[in-house]
Amino acid sequence: MDDLLLLSEAQMRRIEPYFPLSHGVARVDDRRVLSGILFVIRNGLRWRDAPAAYGPPKTIYNRFIGWSRLGVFNRIFAELAGGSDTSDRLMIDATHLKAHRTAASLLKKGLLPRCIGRSRGGLTTKLHAVCDGSGRPIRLVLTEGQTSDYKGAAMLVDTLPPAKAMLADRGYDADWFRKALAERGIAPCIPSKINRKVQISHDRTLYRQRHRIENMFARLKDWRRIHTWYDRCAHTFLSAIAFAASFIFWLNQ
């Protein structure tokens, strides 16, 4: 059992203010349950297979679903990542995440979008992210797998914090995006598309740092329930991503 994940007391102190208070019968220790949630997400387990050390699997699952619906994990991520809103450079990119057949069922429940679409990789979801200069995610959004990069950028551009430069690949080379960045005082470091009539130069030395956002996606995808998602609700999946990102990039700082 030495490989079990357990949040430290210091980590719990940083996130416990975001959870609703317990009323009535004392509930299973939050630290154990949250550690169990992270363990399931990291190892790609079914909820019923969560180790007994974390408490009853049903409790772990119900707590995750309930807190997801309340937006708890998204708030934790937003608050922890908000401390990086003074970065001098930002990076934006997107990656495909495979949808398991249990998530890709044609049966649609609820009013929220499923965020599952068909791309060259099959049924996928696309995760769009903005990172700070250290490669730590500060903004996350999900769309259908076939959504273009610049449409994802349109969903994120109004939320960008102040910065000096934005690093992005040529998939983001659109006049409207460059203009939106300039209006915010952010210099675009984006290679021009091949078919652009007048090529726009960019800082090649600075652009080499863009690998950090690729590394961020790689670290997230090491967590099996993020690499492939099984939940039928997009907001539940985004909660899993937000909590994993909070733990990997912010709670371990």
Residue ranges and their predicted role:
Residues M1-Q253:
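Short alpha-helical elements
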